[in-house]
Curated annotation (Swiss-Prot):
Main EC class the enzyme belongs to: ligase
Segments passing through the bilayer: none
Pfam (any one): Anticodon_2
GO biological process: glutamyl-tRNA aminoacylation; post-embryonic development; reproductive structure development
Similarity field: Belongs to the class-I aminoacyl-tRNA synthetase family. Glutamate--tRNA ligase type 1 subfamily.
GO molecular function: ATP binding; glutamate-tRNA ligase activity; tRNA binding; zinc ion binding
Protein known as: Glutamate--tRNA ligase, chloroplastic/mitochondrial
Keyword field: Aminoacyl-tRNA synthetase, ATP-binding, Chloroplast, Ligase, Mitochondrion, Nucleotide-binding, Plastid, Protein biosynthesis, RNA-binding, Transit peptide
Motif ('HIGH' region): 50-60
Length: 560
């Protein structure tokens, strides 16, 4: 292509660039759902385009979520496109893992590599013919040219730019080379790239739906490569061709892609495609305000899934990283989010990932599950670790109901149940906190309790459940002239071995049921009522009293 032909094309590109690529939107337009969110009268089509080179990062998951919510809230299409042009790092296993994680989150897509669609293929590695077709169009129009510069020549240009303290833009001769010079190199078989001609003057502006007006000076860019010498297309060229030919109306992505928008806008213009609207969301930050990375702990969706987090909790928490509905409400189902999500409420400042808040959020969603699902989750967890041996007795149901308020992660249910079934009487009676309980004639309560158990009275009451317990404890209190805290605190310590915990009546009834049903495995640390009363009978109360006054050694035998 002769240089004179290109210069005419370049001049036309420069003159028409700003009004064609970036129609100015008023502040009012940016704030309204109709113009800013809908992108005009065409259908809403958004995409999430992961690279299958690793696990799905929470940042990528949030980007996918925002795209999903935007599409679903406007009756649009959510497209999944796999950007696998990095052939060395891309793997099928990683692609499958990303798709699995998206499905686990409940982010179903309308078009994608697994289900197809009208605008496929949906893997970049399968779209090379399309990229070559559009690269040829740019070559024929004069928007790109062949560059025969070697790596050594390009490196020298960078060194020169550094010495001159100017942006390292392309300064080679091939932008203005004659047809004869180009033909000579082609005949020699010299490798070449395709470079895009960038206007040397002017600026480019876009109105980002989140960040507002963003502009770049074109003289800082320089001519850039769109096709490598091995025929592989470059990222920005692929993305532009893909978004244009897939008719993407809105590009919602991370702010780290904002610099790419300049190159992509130029390619859109040169190919004659309409520009989508752009929305660049903030990065997710670590508590120290640095970019969230593996050194800060778990960062992938798969890791949180393995740790026992619920998908609905992950979705809820990720949505709140940079978005809110303007109220104090923090609990949202995915249907709530679809109903309330608007792009104008996405914050442009960085959002801090708080693992503690995520765990709290998971607890909220765990406890909001229908009772049958909640119980099944607990039961499945206990069975998977071998703690629960059977569930016919109703033990799992009662244990789940008793423990759910203190559990935020289902994987914590193991430790919670083991703690509930344990009997650390030795540690409790030896503690400073128990001193007042011991001094309140605890030995007398223990003596009466042992008598009630040996006679079968207590066992019968527990077998009758809560009604039986209430009758028995009322009678026991009258006999020993105790009520309120002076009755229930000693009973809690003597029967559970603890000063604090879930409701005492439910705890003791559950311990009784565990002993009679054989519901739990020995490795749970379960101490039966029989074993508890054996320990109680061996307590040397006189020695314990002295120990409280001057601690030397334990007066309470440890549970075996």
């Amino acid at each position: 292509m002769a240089a004179s032909n290109f210069m005419g094309s370049s001049a036309r590109l420069r003159v028409g660039l700003l009004p064609s690529v970036t129609p100015r939107l008023s502040r009012r337009a940016l704030a309204t759902r109709a113009s800013a969110d809908s992108g005009g009268s065409g259908p809403v089509r958004v995409r999430f385009a992961p690279s299958p080179t690793g696990n799905l990062h929470v940042g990528g998951a949030r980007t996918a979520l925002f795209n999903y919510l935007f599409a679903r809230s406007r009756g649009g299409k959510f497209v999944l496109r796999v950007e696998d042009t990095d052939l060395e790092r891309s793997t099928k296993k990683s692609e499958e893992a990303v798709l699995t994680d998206l499905s686990w989150l409940g982010l179903d897509w309308d078009e994608g590599p697994d289900i197809g669609g009208d605008f496929g293929p949906y893997r970049q590695s399968e779209r090379n013919a399309l990229y070559k077709e559009h690269a040829q169009k740019l070559m024929e129009s004069g928007a790109v040219y062949r560059c025969f510069c070697s790596n050594e020549e390009l490196e020298k240009m960078k060194e020169t730019a550094n010495r001159m303290k100017i942006p390292p833009v392309y300064m080679g001769k091939w932008a203005t080379a004659s047809d004869a010079e180009v033909q000579q190199e082609l005949e020699k078989g010299t490798p070449y790239t395709y470079r895009f001609r960038v206007p040397k003057e002017g600026s480019l502006k876009i109105n980002d739906l989140i960040r507002g007006e963003v502009s770049w000076n074109l003289n800082t860019l320089g001519d850039f490569v769109i096709m490598r010498s091995n025929g592989q297309p470059v990222y920005n060229f692929c993305v532009t061709v893909d978004d244009a030919t897939m008719r993407i109306s809105h590009v919602i992505r991370a702010e780290e892609h904002l610099p790419n928008t300049l190159r992509q806008a130029l390619i859109y213009k040169a190919l004659g495609f309409a520009m989508p609207l752009f929305a660049h969301v903030s990065l997710i930050l670590a508590p120290d305000k640095s970019k969230l990375s593996k050194r800060h702990g778990a960062t992938s969706v798969g890791q949180y899934k393995e740790m026992g987090y619920l998908p609905q909790a992950m979705v809820n928490y990720l949505a709140l990283l940079g978005w809110g509905d303007g109220t104090e409400n923090e609990f949202f189902t995915i249907d709530d989010l679809v109903e309330k999500f608007t792009i104008d409420r996405v914050n442009k400042s960085g959002a801090v990932f708080d693992a503690t808040k995520l765990k709290w959020m998971n607890g909220q969603h765990l406890r909001s599950l229908p009772s049958d699902l909640l119980i099944k989750d607990f039961e499945d967890q206990w069975r998977s670790t071998g703690i629960l041996l059977e569930s016919e007795s109703g033990f799992a149901k009662e244990a789940a109901e008793l423990l759910k308020e203190g559990i935020d992660l289902i994987t914590d249910a193991d430790a919670a149940l083991c703690k509930l079934l344990s009997y650390p009487l030795h540690e409790t009676l030896s503690s400073d906190e128990a001193k007042s309980v011991v001094e309140d004639k605890l030995s007398e309560v223990a003596s009466g309790l042992i008598s009630a158990y040996d006679s079968g009275e207590l066992d019968q009451a527990l077998a009758e459940g809560h009604d039986g317990w209430k009758k028995w404890v009322k009678s026991f209190g009258k006999t020993h002239k105790r009520k309120g805290k002076s009755l229930f605190m000693p009973l809690r310590v003597l029967l559970t071995g603890k000063l604090h915990g879930p409701a005492m009546d439910s705890t003791v009834i559950l311990v009784h049921k565990a002993g009679t049903s054989g519901a739990v495995a020995p490795q749970s640390g379960f101490v039966s009522l029989d074993e508890r009363f054996k320990i109680l009978k061996e307590v040397n109360w006189e020695s314990l009293q002295k120990q409280q006054e001057s601690p030397v050694e334990s007066a309470v035998p440890a549970a075996s």
